[in-house]
Amino acid sequence: MQQRVIVGMSGGVDSSVSAALLLQQGYQVEGLFMKNWEEDDGTEYCTAMEDLADAQAVADKIGIKLHTANFAMEYWDRVFEHFLAEYAAGRTPNPDILCNKEIKFRAFLDHAMTLGADFIATGHYARRAETAYNSKGEAYAPLLRGLDNNKDQTYFLHAVHGREINKTLFPVGEIEKPEVRRIAEELDLATAKKKDSTGICFIGERRFNDFLKQYLPAQPGKIVLDNGKEVGEHHGLMYYTLGQRGGIGLGGMKGASEGAWFVLHKDVTNNRLVVGQGHDHPLMQSTQLWSESIDWVAGEQNIPAEGLRCTAKTRYRQPDQACTVFIDENSEHGVRVEFDEPQRAVTPGQSVVFYSDEVCLGGGVIHHTNAPTPNFI
């Protein structure tokens, strides 16, 4: 009997080719287009209808049914409110990670099961290993890096539990992006030449500062140098991220050298933005970070007393960094990560993700680091 797969079809080339490949592999395939954001009608940002039309065109071309589902309420409650709270607290969140955990691999998976699916599939560049069992006897599938190292998306998938991965297929995870484009062109799919989306998960390509302003009041404050000297005003700490180059508004400052300006520190208590010159400024350097809660793909924490040797990324596409992970005795579920080499601009609110060779072990949100605090704070 054919196994039934529901493919999350976004209107992009990766999910389009995923559906086509699964058909070729003999699965009974249907698509599902998720609407996860209520667009402001008539705005320039309204891409959801275009994406739905593209997904429908592909479904028609390859001869499969396309379902639609609206998860906008779930997205608002489980992802967007957290996103706003993090920005309000002066941190820089990554909503795509929470969106994958709560929407694409929970709300979508649950909905697909009501449609009689054996598996869901997505267009992510990741792979899964054969079903394994943790020490509690729970079945899960280990998460593996995508074959195309340049496109690997396990950084964004680390918070998805292995039991959900066990119900998921990643058809394009086994091939490289140029091959995906080639397959789409060969099959004459409407999405073959469509550019990859880069906006916030489900919110699209809108101007970020304008978008954030609609939900959080801007709180302007002082810009200060690393010695505490006031040199200007910022528009609100939420618009800046640690290590950011430029966009600070200090070009041509009298008496300053020609070098670029970088965001070194966000003094949330006093609403001050600390800036300085030098790509590797000491205030941006850290060797340790703390995370208060870790999502382990296997559903359990296996950190020996002497620490877990592995590699980690603190941002997407960063080369793997050697580290040791320790249980944080001061936190119920947290860890302390000690890097072999100093790290630049590790950003609270972003995620640290752990790897053992090809296997993505899991990760968590960065709470704080041991980067030095400016001496005037």
From Swiss-Prot:
GO terms for biological process: tRNA wobble position uridine thiolation. Keywords: ATP-binding, Cytoplasm, Disulfide bond, Nucleotide-binding, RNA-binding, Transferase, tRNA processing, tRNA-binding. It catalyses: S-sulfanyl-L-cysteinyl-[protein] + uridine(34) in tRNA + AH2 + ATP = 2-thiouridine(34) in tRNA + L-cysteinyl-[protein] + A + AMP + diphosphate + H(+). The keyword Repressor does not apply. Residues 94-96 are annotated as: Interaction with target base in tRNA. The record marks 124, 350 as: Interaction with tRNA. GO terms for cellular component: cytoplasm. Its main location: cytoplasm. Disulfide bonds join 99-201. The active site is at residues 99, 201. Catalyzes the 2-thiolation of uridine at the wobble position (U34) of tRNA, leading to the formation of s(2)U34. Belongs to the MnmA/TRMU family. This is tRNA-specific 2-thiouridylase MnmA. The lineage of its organism: Bacteria, Pseudomonadati, Pseudomonadota, Gammaproteobacteria, Moraxellales. The gene is mnmA.
